Amino acid sequence: MAKSPVNNAAQRVRKKVRKNVADGIAHVHASFNNTIITITDRQGNALSWASSGGQGFKGSRKSTPFAAQVASEVAGRAAIDQGIKNLDVEIRGPGPGRESSVRALGALGIRITSISDVTPVPHNGCRPQKRRRI
């Protein structure tokens, strides 16, 4: 049996709620393959986010510092629209987009109050993967 056409009222589109938040946290996840930037308020509610792959970079170009810079600018502009003025930056991961993403946020005029490295380090937990042989 064929499905009936969906009502427009049933398709709810959530409107962006503009919050007025002055201070926030920028979570930069820099892996070897991609860089993801999420800007949250102090409680951890996401205000904006962007990734290198989401900005049109594909394959090995996602992991470049320039791709991380572009993603940071997009996330930063959206956060400025939400009222962000001060940011604490938490960097996670060893990727090449670590530094350039922080510089891009600072260049937008956002005051960076602290930069901290929160990369998870095991206290000799799980056995690591075998060595790559190229």
Curated annotation (Swiss-Prot):
GO terms for biological process: translation. Pfam families: Ribosomal_S11 (PF00411). Keywords: Ribonucleoprotein, Ribosomal protein, RNA-binding, rRNA-binding. The keyword Nucleotide-binding does not apply. One of its GO terms (molecular function) is structural constituent of ribosome. One of its GO terms (cellular component) is ribonucleoprotein complex. The keyword Cell cycle does not apply. SUPFAM superfamilies: Translational machinery components. Part of the 30S ribosomal subunit. Interacts with proteins S7 and S18. Binds to IF-3. Located on the platform of the 30S subunit, it bridges several disparate RNA helices of the 16S rRNA. Forms part of the Shine-Dalgarno cleft in the 70S ribosome. PANTHER family: 40S RIBOSOMAL PROTEIN S14/30S RIBOSOMAL PROTEIN S11. HAMAP family: Ribosomal_uS11. Belongs to the universal ribosomal protein uS11 family. This is Small ribosomal subunit protein uS11.
